[in-house]
Each structure stands twice: as C-alpha cells, then as structure tokens.
C-alpha cells in the first residue's frame, strides 16, 4: 500500500513538472521583480521556502530580482528603543531619528537574512540597497512623512550586471536624496515598482498578506485591466493598504512593465504557482490577454 501511494505521489509530481515546462520555457530569460513584504516573510521556514522558489526561478533561466520590505521588524526595533511608530495614509512617518533605525533594519538585518536564505538554498545572492551605485535617488515624497523618498532617478545597470553574472540581487529600499546626501526610507512597493519600471521587467510580483484585489462582494479578482483598477479606486472598492499597491502596479505598467500580480506571499510556493501554472495566483493586472490561457502554446506566443 505504501509503495502504491509513493508511486502515485511520484506520478503526480512528474505530471506537475511536465505541465510546468511550457511556462518555464516562456519565462526563460525574463526579468521578474519580486517584492517580498515584511508581512509575507513569516517564520524561518516561510523564508526558506521563498528562497527555494527564487533559486528555482534562477535555475530555469529567469532573472529574479528581489526587493524587500521589513515593516514588522522596524516596528519591533523601534518599540524596543521606546520610539513610537506613526503612519499617515498607510505610509510610515520617518524622522531623522528613525531613519537610521530603518536603514539598520532593512540593510543590515532583513536584507542579509534573505541573502543568507537564498545562499543556503543553493543560490548566489548579493545584498545591496538603493544607495549602492546610486541605484535609487529620491526626493521627499510628502512633508508629512519626513524622510520618506520618492524615486526620481534610477540607475539599474548594477542590477543587470549582477543577474547577468548569475547572481540574484536582493535590494533594501533605502536611498540617497537629491541634495545633501540625506538617507531616505522608500516604501517597499514603491521601490519595487520603480525598479521593475526601470528594468522594463516582464513581471512584477507584489507579495503581501492578502489573497489579491477583491471586488465589492469580497471575491478575489484573478485578472484586471488597468482601467478597471482605476475605477475601483475611484468608487472606493479598492481601499486602505491596497490603494498604494494598486497605484504602484498602475505606475509600473505605465513605465513598461508587462504585467503586475498582487498575491498572497503566505501561500506555499506562491511565486511558482503564479509563473508556472495555468491559472496563476492572486490578481494579475495588465492591458492585454486574459488570465486563463490554453495549455497548448501558439507558435511564437511569448505568453508573458
């Protein structure tokens, strides 16, 4: 009985791999930017599973670029230091006092934890921040937010150099200001969107702690046109923390990203489900093509 069950499991695994092959072929050579949010990081096992997904993507010819957040970790350290976390319209208020803590957590703690997890999974990851090689240069986003930056200049050649050398870039969202070399905290989604736009990425995956964008009845929408997203923001269907994520998606599409997906990073193998299965995972936003595609690929159809 045990042998029969093992055989069935092996057959199912082999079938899954076989069905994934056309999607792996489609994405070979593609640039996929993955925003790994603090809320999606979970425990060490969740981190290890995410790292294995990223290494597999690299192994099959994708160029994954990881941009991460770290809000819960920042809140935790600020709390230990007796500093209150404040937010305006869902964005962190970053004072001169807290920006050093933010940089320490993002660049020194979270970034290196992700790099180590990817390396432990057999990949070759390199951790950098938006400051390195002037990758991201910012202006103040909003006077109410303090040292929170909005990227205005991007130099992504360092990212291309890394992934073309077989490395996996892992980017902490802190950046240099246009004036006086001030340090700015950049919202993780904003940073990922700006990086994806500058790279003209094939996919931007925004991993979060919800299943995707929901309609008025609470159902997750698996595919959306940008005009539909704008209408849902205007009528209040998209609200709260989903507004900045969908606005990031729209801006990234305007800047040349082929498609954006908002998906639940807590789901095991979420990135692989999105890229290598017929129905994907989460909410896909793009201007053309439906979510559900036939298994048989048309000659010359990139499918991205």
Swiss-Prot record:
Pathway annotation from the record: Amino-acid biosynthesis; L-arginine biosynthesis; N(2)-acetyl-L-ornithine from L-glutamate: step 2/4
Main EC class the enzyme belongs to: transferase
Catalytic activity reported: N-acetyl-L-glutamate + ATP = N-acetyl-L-glutamyl 5-phosphate + ADP
Gene Ontology terms, MF aspect: acetylglutamate kinase activity; ATP binding
Residues marked Transition state stabilizer (site): 35, 245
Annotated GO biological process: arginine biosynthetic process via ornithine; L-arginine biosynthetic process
Membrane-traversing stretches: none
UniProt-listed Pfam families: AA_kinase
Domain of life of the native organism: Bacteria
Entry keywords, A to Z: Amino-acid biosynthesis, Arginine biosynthesis, ATP-binding, Cytoplasm, Kinase, Nucleotide-binding, Transferase
Gene Ontology CC annotations of this record: cytoplasm
Chief location category: cytoplasm
Binding-site list for substrate: 70-71, 92, 185
Cystine bridges: none
Subcellular location: Cytoplasm
Catalytic activity, EC: 2.7.2.8
Gene3D superfamilies: Acetylglutamate kinase-like
Family to which this protein belongs: Belongs to the acetylglutamate kinase family. ArgB subfamily.
Protein function: Catalyzes the ATP-dependent phosphorylation of N-acetyl-L-glutamate.
NCBIfam families noted in UniProt: argB
Protein name: Acetylglutamate kinase
């Amino acid at each position: 009985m045990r042998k029969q069950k093992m055989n069935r499991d092996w057959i199912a695994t082999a079938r899954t791999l076989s069905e994934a092959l056309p999607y792996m072929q489609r994405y070979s050579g593609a640039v996929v930017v993955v925003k790994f949010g603090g809320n999606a990081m979970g425990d060490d096992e969740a981190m290890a599973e995410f790292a294995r997904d990223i290494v597999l993507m690299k192994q099959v010819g994708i160029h994954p670029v990881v941009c991460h957040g770290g809000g819960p970790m920042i809140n935790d350290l600020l709390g230990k230091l007796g500093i209150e976390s404040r937010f305006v319209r869902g964005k962190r208020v970053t004072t001169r006092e807290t920006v050093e803590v933010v940089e320490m957590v993002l660049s020194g703690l979270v970034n290196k934890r992700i790099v180590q997890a990817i390396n432990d999974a057999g990949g070759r990851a390199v951790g950098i921040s938006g400051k390195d090689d002037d990758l991201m240069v910012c202006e103040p986003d909003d006077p109410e937010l303090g040292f929170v930056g909005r990227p205005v200049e991007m130099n992504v050649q360092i990212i291309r150099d890394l992934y073309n050398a077989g490395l996996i870039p892992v980017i902490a969202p802190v950046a240099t200001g246009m004036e006086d070399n001030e340090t700015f905290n950049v919202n993780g989604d904003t940073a990922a969107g700006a990086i994806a736009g500058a790279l003209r990425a094939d996919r931007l995956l925004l991993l979060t702690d919800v299943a995707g964008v929901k309609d008025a009845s609470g159902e997750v929408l698996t595919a959306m046109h940008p005009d539909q997203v704008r209408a849902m923001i205007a009528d209040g269907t998209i609200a709260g923390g989903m507004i900045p994520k969908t606005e990031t998606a729209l801006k990234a599409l305007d800047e040349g990203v082929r498609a954006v997906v908002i998906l639940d990073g807590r789901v095991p193998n979420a990135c692989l489900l999105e890229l290598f299965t017929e129905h994907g995972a989460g909410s896909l936003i793009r201007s053309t093509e439906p979510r559900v595609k036939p298994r048989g690929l048309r000659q010359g159809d990139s499918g991205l």
